[in-house]
Design a protein with these regions (language model features):
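S-adenosylmethionine/decaboxylated-SAM
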Residues: 1-122
């Protein structure tokens, strides 16, 4: 998949602006200097670390940067209080974390498995 992405980036003339990093996410995020800003991040990884990814990215997010998070509705399981497996609880906690975060604006879309688009408040 990365080869296909690289081809499209090159065709669009943005290949010099995108850094593709394939490594454990938290480890990689911790290596990015605090001063280096991230314009866009897409979170779709182990659900138990969603809050950790979010906070690590937020600290490096540019003024108009966006964080897009996948699986926030988890096939509707997050609203069913009788479902309490580890991933469902983690996503529920993440959604509550973002809801309570006064630093951001968030729109949750019911596309697919649910996607949140999060922007740092101006």
């Amino acid at each position: 998949w990365t080869d296909i992405a690289k081809q499209h980036w090159k065709q669009a003339g943005v290949d010099g602006k995108i850094d593709l990093i394939l490594a454990p996410a938290l480890e990689t995020l911790e290596k990015i200097p605090e001063g280096q800003k991230i314009d866009f991040a897409f979170i779709d990884a182990d659900k138990g670390n969603y809050i950790n990814y979010y906070e690590s990215i937020f600290n490096r997010l540019s003024e108009n940067g966006l964080i897009v998070v996948d699986n926030v509705l988890w096939s509707g399981r997050v609203v069913d209080d009788s479902i309490n497996d580890e991933d469902t609880v983690a996503i529920r906690n993440f959604n509550q974390h973002v809801k309570n975060d006064e630093r951001v604006l968030c729109a949750m879309l019911s596309i697919g498995d649910g996607v949140s688009v999060i922007q740092k408040k101006p």
